[in-house]
Amino acid sequence: MTLPERLPWLFLAASRLRQALFLLFAVILVAGALYTARFGVYNETLVRVGGLGIGILLLLTRPSTTRHLARLLLDLALTALFVAALVRYSMIANMLEFGLYFLVPIDVVLGVGALVVVLEMARRAVGLPLVLVCLVAIGYALFGQHLGGMLSHSGVDMDSLMLTLWYSFDGVFGRPLAVVVGTIIVFIIFGTLLEALGAGDVLLKLAMRGLGWLRGGAAHAAVLASALFGSVSGSAVANVVGTGVVTIPMIKRTGFSGRFAGAVEASASSGGQIMPPIMGAVAFIMADLTGIPYLYICLAALIPALLYYGSLFACISVEAKRLNIERPDRALLPRMTGRDWLMLSTFVVPLGLIIGMLMLGSSPARAGFMAIAVALGLGLLLNREARSLKALQVAVTGAASASAKILVAVAAVGIVVGVMNLTGLGLRFASAAQALSDGSLLMSLIVMAMACLMLGMGMPTVPAYLIIILVMGPAVEALGVPTIAAHMFVVYFAVMSAITPPVALAGYAAASIADASPMGISVTAVRLALMGFLVPFAFVYSPSLLLITDFALGEFVWALLRLGAAIWMLALFAGRGHLWAIAGMLGAILLVLPGLYLQIGVLALAVLAEALYRLRKSGRFGQLNSLSL
């Protein structure tokens, strides 16, 4: 008989204690984030160190179904180790700030222990790939002087490494973590609150009422609802799981295959992170890194996001026509009741408030706080189910869990950032990237895109974006790319990694709901979302698409015409067989690349091919041949 079987009361007591501690830490994290958003940061060390500390304690006390004694003891040991490291940090924080303290062996030991805990929590929260990248970075810092050649550095001892990574704001507690604690958590709370209030269901109903009458209307409605709610939720997988349970079966019932239904939801949910005004979490970190106001970043993201979702709508329309899916009867579409319109205010009013406050110069955190207050007030007034203590607890714990995951992910990225700054690795990578691309902007962009896709396959958008932009961003900007274009380029490919095989996390999430092959869904999602892979190249070569940098009306209009034609070719040609699909893909790629005469030639060929296809389809092609003879 095992120990849990002999002492069930002990494990029951431990489970209840974990639940109580988890709820306590969740309340502290949410309350602290709201307080900081409302009143500002009065102690930077307390906010950063305390925020990460609460986040890790949340993950360590998260309720678990395991009854393995070893796992419980491990969590207890990690908790004790991390608390000891935090206590030690607080004891020497003031002396460290003024440079009046030199680390002693116990500081180094506790610093190493704290990093071990951070990496283990990152492994549990976001997976092994990010941890492996961090371990490679630490190994490079300690032993990189023996590599020789371009990658060699002057050497880093353990004291200097711990001082940078743990006992300063240059590593784990760097600026990205401050942005998460000070701003991003507020918007995570906002998104979780909207979900708890039922805003997602009302948005889907509104989308179905507005677009459901179209051919393939259920799929169109799913795209619109996922775009709107995905911008707030900030997670492709969470959005697929949250809205997909309703939208995917709904799309299948109208005549689409499970594979196509899952692909539509996966591609639409992934795009939520590039849809203004909230864009998940990455826009806030981008604003901090670039110094560009958050509202300007939202404006820059607008046209590319509309092009992306426009291509999804076009692909759905073509597929619906190919399958002979008829328009549904408008009378059968769900009607928006008076209560639905009132509940819609819990989404529209707070979102409008955020935009209005940002335009008036308010900080994103303050705008998010006010939006939460308004959404909560409206929700409690209009939704009786939201007034229960259980509903509030679910919202708080959900927001805290999501926040804890992004906290440890960004903290782990801080290890990589700290090593890069300490060793000069970033400059070496930039030089290597320039040498590899031989000064070619296109090659540099392709290398950066591939790196984003590979890193993004195993980690969330934010850490993938941070690592790539810090490593390769300077090299691309050195080739004349505007800062905002370089950052947006990385974000797009980090987002697209969620549907890119072989990992394709959003595709796997949709597969279980659609009852279809995960790989099949991912391949179809990539086909639907091809504009998501092409638009980044377009706004690098035509920065006017971003509206806020080097704007030229002629370039903007010509770029829109070319991208509109690319959407048309990708969608229409894909429904005519493999050769047409390949031709459409090649044509779309050539329309994105620079070269005026090349672009005009591609457009002319596309129009000619379409005209010949229609003539042949109508039977008049043969008549023309006979007349010419």
List each language-model region with its residue ranges.
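Membrane-interfacial loop-to-helix junctions in multi-pass transporters
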Residues: V104-V109, G171-T183, R209-V223, T254-F260, ...
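Transmembrane alpha-helix interface/packing and boundary motifs in multi-pass membrane proteins
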Residues: G191-E195, S226-S235, S267-Q273, L358, ...
